[in-house]
């Protein structure tokens, strides 16, 4: 069975059996080379990434402690464990509508990083819009006046959002407070 048929057959990620089956499948040699790579992510967690459009994208979250895996992003670059309710829409006020629409569609075309797990949670940075240099060619043409927009949230070991994604406007103290909130929630 190819990987896409596997997901069609196992849509319900809440099903522990499906998560265990996915864990088994992702721990085969096929997902350790070529267009796939598995990297340690701290606390017995791992991220399985796939090359999509020439970039490594975090597709799956593996929890070695419980021998389960969860689809974080699908092959069409849509986030699977993040829902619209997991975004702090107030924090996005004042940014361009097309950027907000990327968040609405849960589009992960631009960089997204799942940082190392610490105290049961991982910080996720999700770039909704790159700065204008992203569009520049090797000769220096094509640059736009776009501003980078990146939002941050925190997830648990299953990829579920614990603290909503929000635009912190580079207020790193706010990010520290979000981490503390996530750790408090997860360790109740």
Across the structure, where does each feature detected by a protein language model lie?
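Short intrinsically disordered terminal tails
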Residues: 1, 12-13, 184-188
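Residue-level detector of conserved, function-critical positions
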Residues: 18-188
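Low-complexity, charge- and small-residue-enriched intrinsically disordered regions
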Residues: 5-18
């Amino acid at each position: 069975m190819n990987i896409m048929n596997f997901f069609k057959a196992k849509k319900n990620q809440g099903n522990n059996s499906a998560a265990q089956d996915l864990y088994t499948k992702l721990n085969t040699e096929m997902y350790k080379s070529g267009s796939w790579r598995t990297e340690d992510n701290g606390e017995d967690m791992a991220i399985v990434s796939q090359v999509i459009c020439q970039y490594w994208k975090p597709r799956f979250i593996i929890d070695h402690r419980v021998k389960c895996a969860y689809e974080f992003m699908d092959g069409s670059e849509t986030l699977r464990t993040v829902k619209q309710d997991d975004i702090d829409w107030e924090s996005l006020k004042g940014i361009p509508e097309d950027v907000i629409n990327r968040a609405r569609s849960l589009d992960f075309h631009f960089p997204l990083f799942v940082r190392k797990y610490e105290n049961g949670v991982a910080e996720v940075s999700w770039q909704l819009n790159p700065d204008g240099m992203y569009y520049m060619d090797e000769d220096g043409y094509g640059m736009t006046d776009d501003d980078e927009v990146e939002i941050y949230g925190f997830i648990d070991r299953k990829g579920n959002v614990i603290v909503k994604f929000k635009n912190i406007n580079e207020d790193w103290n706010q990010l520290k407070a979000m981490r503390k909130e996530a750790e408090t929630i997860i360790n109740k």
